[in-house]
């Protein structure tokens, strides 16, 4: 998606290394979503695998309120994206984010791969403990 958004047309990419976010590790964009994305998305970013465990753990441990959210590896990028965006002045300006903004984060899966989820949760919990 990132490459296609950047060049403004469907673009296939060769995947050099698979991501732990298996559902997002695709070489091309599906045609139906592309019809929507090409005319409505102005900004796009890529999330590294290393950032996933901490977000999975923060969501699971209720760091953002009273709710505990079981968010798998393809849901955590929503949290990472808003965190990165709010901590970068240029991105905040580009997205017109401020204290009055309302942001909807969509998580597209829970713990669909329980072994991977537990591994990410354990690693992320360790990161939280180590500060």
Across the structure, where does each feature detected by a protein language model lie?
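Glycine-rich phosphate/pyrophosphate-binding loop at beta-loop-alpha junctions
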Residues: 1-39, 92-126
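Active-site-adjacent helical/loop segments in soluble small-molecule enzymes
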Residues: 30-96
């Amino acid at each position: 998606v990132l490459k296609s958004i950047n060049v403004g047309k469907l673009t296939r990419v060769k995947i050099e290394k698979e991501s732990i976010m298996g559902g997002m590790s695709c070489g091309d964009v599906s045609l139906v979503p592309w019809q929507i994305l090409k005319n409505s998305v102005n900004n796009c970013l890529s999330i590294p695998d290393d950032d996933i465990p901490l977000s999975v753990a923060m969501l699971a441990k209720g760091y953002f309120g009273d709710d505990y959210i079981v968010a798998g590896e393809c849901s955590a990028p929503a949290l990472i994206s808003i965190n990165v965006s709010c901590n970068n002045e240029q991105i905040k300006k580009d997205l017109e984010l401020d204290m009055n903004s309302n942001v909807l984060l969509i998580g597209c899966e829970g713990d669909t791969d329980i072994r991977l989820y537990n591994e990410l949760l354990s690693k992320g919990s360790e990161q939280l403990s180590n500060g």
